[in-house]
Amino acid sequence: MKGRVIVLGEIEGHEVAALLEDGRLEDLALDDDAAFTPGSILRGTVGRPVKGLGGVFVDLPEGQSGFLRAPKGLRPGQSILVQITGVAEEGKAFPLTQRLLFKSRYAIVTPDAPGLNVSRAIRDEDIRKDLTDLATEAMTGADESLGLILRSVCEEAAEDEIADDILQVRGLAEAVLKDVDGKPELLVDAPGPHELAWRDWGDADEVDESPEALDHHGVLDQLAALSGPEVRLEGGASMWIEATRAFVAVDVNTGPDTSPAAGLKASIAAARDLPRQLRLRGLGGMVLVDFAPCPKRDRHVLEQVLNKAFRADAGEASMAGWTPLGNFELARRRDRAALPGWVA
């Protein structure tokens, strides 16, 4: 089907949400069996500092541990509020931040980051002014340290829905911020896949939650393809993506094309699709790409394609550049778990 479709369903009792654009899988949300998932807000207890790593460990509920980088003014035993920012690798602590974000469908409340802001994606000045006035009224009486961001989906939403949403998320933020003292505790759980789809994927041309929706829209077939390392590209080229404990290895092959431009064409196709593949597979950390052979003078073309592709991706990424052996190195934040076994 053409257009933007959100598909909701279950696989072996696990919630699944898929975002399709013109039939192609663009984003995915799956049940995660981890103790805590990115976005969860907790009360923790400051543990020992680790000078060599530039941070402190934080005791979390259920005997779990988190790691907070560059803390300021914290003492061991102190209770603090933290938010999970990524996935904990096996045997490692959860990455944490003290910069909390309270997200809802229309608004984001930002403690200690004051100001009322409207998404830059909304360009109509009259709409921006109306939304600013609405936000100002909804935040009347709030602590001056609370900021607010109105999300792009507000452009087409009814004012009363936006106002109710702001008041609800503001109330949640105010209640949590008062609940600092005490033992480690989960205060706000991250949304499940279906709720996350409603909150973060905006409006769609269709939302299908019928029993056969995953099969009907081809989601199951596309998930099966993700369970293997090979990604088929245009012109018979391919990209192999394999995760090791240290990094994600990506190998790009030209296939049957033997023309002089084959290497560059295959590498450009791989660069364009790489952010989507990493996102759907739940892969992050260091990524090392062995592009198909092409002249050094064409490397700047690949860099431009990579930068454009990752700018459009929601995950944070940094481009380290070319290694002495001619591979390209980048890093992507681990913002979700790798595909679980029940997906295949």
Task: Label each residue range with its predicted role.
Residues Q64-S65, P114-L116, E155-E156, T254-D257, ...:
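A short, flexible beta-alpha/helix-coil linker loop
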Residues G54-V58, A88-E90, F94-V109, V169, ...:
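Conserved glycine-centered short motifs in functionally critical loops
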Residues V7, V16-L19, R43-T45, F57-D59, ...:
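Structured core elements
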Residues M1-A35, S40, E89, T97-D143, ...:
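Extended, charged alpha/beta regions that create polyanion-binding interfaces
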Residues L74-Q78, P111, R151-C154, V250-T254, ...:
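Short loop/turn segments at strand-loop or loop-helix junctions that form parts
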Residues R43, T132, L220, I268-P275:
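Short, well-ordered alpha-helical scaffold segments within catalytic/effector domains
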Residues R4-E21, D27-D31, A35-V87, A93:
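S1/OB-fold single-stranded RNA-binding interface
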